[in-house]
Amino acid sequence: MRLSGKVAVVTGAGSGMGRSTALLFAREGATVVGSDINAANLEAVTAEATAAGGKMIGVLGNIAKREDAEALIQRAIDDYGQLDVLVNNAGIMDAMEGVANFKDETFERVMGVNLYGPFVTCRAAVKHMKERGKGAIVNVASVAGVSGAAAGAVYTASKHALIGLSRNTAYAYAPFGVRCNTLIVGGVETAIMAGADPAKFDHEALAQYGKWHAVNPRTLQPDEVAKLSLFLVSDEASGVNGAEVAVDGGWTAAC
């Protein structure tokens, strides 16, 4: 198992890509500390991981709040004495507002989850990882982080900035054995694509959206993203640092 003996924190673990990542990491031998704002979802994925023979605990919290983000990292260290892996997966979309009409509350909410939360968790994690001389971080961004659009100004800006955080972290902490990479994710079949309301998820519309932008005419599944996260945090990717790695079905081929 590729993560045997390692402790991994996964944010947004209650659904979508985070859920798939937490379950896969647990199957690969990691002790998973999963965080989510949705108690029912977090309880369900924790139970599923445990029932399958894995090790996972759930920590309820809002990653956009400094105290919750810091407590999450500290919980892993306090309970298990180490932190080997951090996956900043939690993310939300805006109302697809352009720069001329975005709302202040939208900016604060989206930047809080998509950027401030990862800043705080990275800050807490790298201090511990530096002392241990090893660690791996994956920040989950988006094709919006390497391209532009007429709408979604705040979301796009948050993902561009997240890539900057990853690069800076990789450069600063490489001498101490800490790696940090970014996943560039395309259209994935998750609740975030429907405003976090699964009942509104339009599979056909999302598939068509993907066709306009990608070589691969289908939406991706959360498991496909999780598998790449697994590779990036494993020892197999020991030479990969400060990189943006796309799992987008070919979307960025046109960028």
Where are these regions (language model features)?
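Short C-terminal tail/terminal secondary-structure segment
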Residues: M93-M96, S147, K211, L230, ...
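Short, small/polar-rich loop/turn modules that mediate ligand/substrate recognition or access, typified
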Residues: A174, R179, V240-G242
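A conserved structural motif in NAD(P)-dependent oxidoreductases
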Residues: A214-V225
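Residue(s) in the substrate-gating loop at a strand-loop-helix junction
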Residues: S142
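Conserved glycine-rich cofactor-binding loop
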Residues: V7, G14-G16
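Substrate-binding pocket helix/loop in short-chain dehydrogenase/reductase
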Residues: E97-V99, K103-E108, Y209-G210
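Active-site helix of classical SDR
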Residues: C122, S158, S166
